[in-house]
């Protein structure tokens, strides 16, 4: 594994990637942002990531399918699910199927940074949460 934690961030809402990509880069993650789950899946087939952050509900493919693919092909990868408040039961189901953690929308970038730091520690890596600097 390189020094930087490799993160794939998938959410069909453009603002999520726009805000969270730079927030994660500040703590030492190398982030690839996707809005299209099909494109994200194609990338996952070519590259292994340390952490995958995915929305559960998307149009073409849902986050549960991404979770299942990652679990089958890269069991070391930690998957963090993003969900709306109305989908907490679905997030719990994702945890039962092997997701590392989940975050309910709306959330702050610091909330995701904390979960990323926890996932990095579980992988034996680290990110510098304190270098995040100013809140977003």
Question: Across the structure, where does each feature detected by a protein language model lie?
Answer:
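Short amphipathic alpha-helix used as the core "switch/output" element in two-component signaling
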Residues: 42, 64-76, 93
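Conserved acidic segment of CheY-like receiver
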Residues: 4-15, 20-24, 52
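Short hydrophobic/Thr-rich beta-strand motif most characteristic of the beta2 strand and flanking loop
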Residues: 28-35, 43
């Amino acid at each position: 594994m390189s020094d930087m934690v490799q993160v794939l961030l998938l959410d069909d809402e453009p603002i999520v990637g726009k805000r969270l990509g730079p927030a994660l880069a500040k703590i030492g993650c190398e982030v690839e942002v996707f809005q299209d789950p099909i494109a994200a899946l194609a990338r996952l087939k070519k590259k292994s990531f340390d952490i995958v952050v995915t929305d559960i509900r998307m149009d073409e493919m849902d986050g549960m399918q991404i979770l299942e693919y990652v679990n089958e092909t890269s069991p070391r990868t930690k998957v963090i699910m993003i969900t709306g408040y109305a989908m907490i039961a679905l997030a719990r189901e994702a945890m039962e199927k092997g997701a590392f953690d989940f975050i309910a929308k709306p959330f702050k970038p610091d909330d995701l940074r904390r979960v990323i730091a926890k996932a990095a520690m579980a992988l034996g890596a680290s990110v510098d949460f304190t270098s995040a600097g100013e809140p977003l």
